[in-house]
From Swiss-Prot:
InterPro entries linked: CsbD, UPF0337_stress_rsp, YjbJ_sf
Descriptive protein name: UPF0337 protein RB4474
Organism: Rhodopirellula baltica (strain DSM 10527 / NCIMB 13988 / SH1)
Classification via PANTHER family: UPF0337 PROTEIN YJBJ
Gene3D superfamilies: YjbJ
Pfam families named among the record's database cross-references: CsbD (PF05532)
Record-stated family: Belongs to the UPF0337 (CsbD) family.
Amino acid sequence: MVNRQELQGHWNEVKGRLKEHWGQLTEDDLQQARGSAEQLVGVVQQKTGATQNEIEKFLDSVLNRNFTDQASETVQQYSEAAQAAAADAAAYARQNYQRLASQSGEYGAKLADTVRTRPGESLAIAFGLGIAAGAILFFGNKK
C-alpha cells in the first residue's frame, strides 16, 4: 500500500496518471484526497467503480516506476562519469606513451651517435657490462 510520504512526494505525477487511466476523475475529485492514500483510494473507487486492490496496484506501479526511473538515471550518471574517467585515463596513457616513445628514440639516437664517435670506449663498456652480468648470473645460481 502506498504511504502518505510517497503520495505527497509524487503527487503531480500520481494525479496525472490517475486522470490518464480513469478519465472520469476531475481535478476537484483528486484535490479532495490530496495527501491521504486511503481517501484517494476511496474517491477513485467511488467515481470509477474500480476495486480497492486494483487502485492500490495501480498506485504502486506508478510509484515503483518513478523509483525505477530515478535508479535508472542514477546508474546512467555513474556510467557517464565512469566513461569520462576511462577516456581521461586513456588520453593520459596515450600522451605519456608518446612522450616516452620520443624520449627512447632520442636516447637510442644519442647511443648510436656515441658508439659511432667513440667505438673503443663503447666496446669496453659493453665488455664490462657483459662480465658484470655473467658474474651476477654465475654467483646467483650458486646460492
